[in-house]
Amino acid sequence: MLEKIYSNIDWVFHLAGLADIVPSIEFPDNYFQTNVIGSYNIAKLSLEKNVKRTIYAASSSCYGIPDFFPTPETAKCDPRYPYALTKYLGEQIFMHWSSVYRLNVLSLRLFNVYGPRARTSGTYGAVFGVFLAQKLAGKPFTVVGDGTQTRDFTFVSDVCRAFLIAAQSQLSGEILNVGSGNTYEVNKLVSLLEGPVINIPKRPAEPDQTFADITKINKLLGWKPEVSLEEGVAVMLEHLQDWKDAPLWDTNKIEGATKSWFKYLADSH
């Protein structure tokens, strides 16, 4: 099947994969088959078919709980759960193929991407999807901890531009952070969305902050983000109806959905 897709292709954008933390803990085999073996298959075919450039969508979750903020690409990688590990292993396959076989590839480590047409179904996960479904239903936002944790919320159009610029470049064998150039409290997001709040227990193995150092991608590719959080949230609210069929998470459902998270990651170091 992949062989047919690969006819007359100049660029490959490898975004296919399994996301979400809890399912990766419960079904690690699926994640290894898709995110690791799948990435190997893409690297192999990209080389065989002489693709001009392959761009891999890596995850900033590879950093685990970073020691430095903003976090540079040289920071230690310490994935804390199978999703993060499998995305990191996929990246390492591409970097190895670049080093050994001279595959033209770049890896973009994405930070907290959000925007219209995001997935609206599936397991409990990204804060934007959870909050937007709650807002549409007139329910309180379920804020993890006290909401002072910060995230590098990065708008999807900025990410798309990074992929395009990377594909058009002559750069290869590099890992590049893609972030907003800022980090925002979850409480800030709540204030922009406007609504009541219920605080739920903080989860283990989650960083208090994500914040990309984007110096490298700016220097090597001239890329920089253009969409502020305020602008991005305004766009999301324009598309609020997209979440009308999304799962609606309350405290009881979240507690049930995250049992494996607490069970296996509570003593994670």
What are these regions (language model features)?
Residues 26, 34-37, 80-81, 122-126, ...:
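Residue-level signal for the nucleotide or nucleotide-sugar donor/cofactor binding architecture
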Residues 1-113, 157, 234, 239, ...:
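N-terminal Rossmann-like NAD(P)+-binding domain of SDR-like oxidoreductases, especially those catalyzing
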